[in-house]
Each structure stands twice: as structure tokens, then as C-alpha cells.
């Protein structure tokens, strides 16, 4: 496992969760989501989105992937990937409130020299 980077994935939905499982093959990963129920199901080995096979989820958890709804748990990361949905309204304008909230959250835990990637 590569020790140089510890990756925090913010948003464990259709994009962030498969990404977290994939990165967990090589890196230390902490997945973060505001939905406690989502965190509980993932930590129990269940993926209600069906984006990841049960075997891939089990492998990610076995490799040390941690999932949490506690923002402070991300402080040990040095790479942050924000994978938050940006739905559009009836006029095709993106709803940016969730993205702004996620950005503020990341801003509360990053350190100088860390990387932030928006997916």
C-alpha cells in the first residue's frame, strides 16, 4: 500500500463510493458522507447503489478503507476528492449549495500542501 497519500473521498454516492473502493486497492482511504445511514450500510458491507460488487466492497474494507460521517476523521488525509452531486433545476442551472457546503467542510480540515480535487 502506498503510504505517501491518504485520500479522503467526500460524498459516497454513485461516483464517490466506487472511486473510494478503487483507490483503497493501493492507498489509505477515508470515505465521508453526511448520511449516517449510508455510512452504516457501507461499514456493514452493503452497497444500496449497486455500484460496487460485494466482493469489491469487502476487499476495500479489508484493505483498511474507513467510512465516516465525522468530518474530523478526514484531518489525517492529504488528498481530498469531492464527489458531490450537482443536480440541475428546470432551467438547467446547477444546484451548487451541496458543493459549496462540501467545500467549506474540506476547508475546515485541509492543511497547507494538501490537494483538493473536484470530480
Language-model features, listed with the residues they occupy:
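Structural/interface elements that position substrates and couple domains in central-metabolism enzymes
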Residues: 1-119
Amino acid at each position: 500500500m502506498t503510504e505517501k497519500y491518504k485520500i479522503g473521498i467526500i460524498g459516497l454516492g454513485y461516483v464517490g463510493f466506487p472511486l473510494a473502493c478503487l483507490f483503497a486497492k493501493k492507498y489509505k482511504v477515508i470515505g465521508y458522507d453526511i448520511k449516517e445511514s449510508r455510512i452504516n450500510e457501507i461499514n456493514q458491507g452493503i452497497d444500496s447503489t449497486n455500484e460496487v460488487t460485494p466482493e469489491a466492497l469487502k476487499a476495500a474494507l479489508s484493505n483498511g478503507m474507513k467510512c465516516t460521517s465525522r468530518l474530523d476523521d478526514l484531518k489525517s488525509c492529504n488528498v481530498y476528492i469531492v464527489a458531490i452531486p450537482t443536480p440541475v433545476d428546470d432551467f438547467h442551472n446547477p444546484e451548487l449549495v451541496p458543493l459549496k457546503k462540501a467545500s467549506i467542510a474540506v476547508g475546515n480540515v485541509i492543511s497547507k500542501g494538501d490537494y483538493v480535487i473536484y470530480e
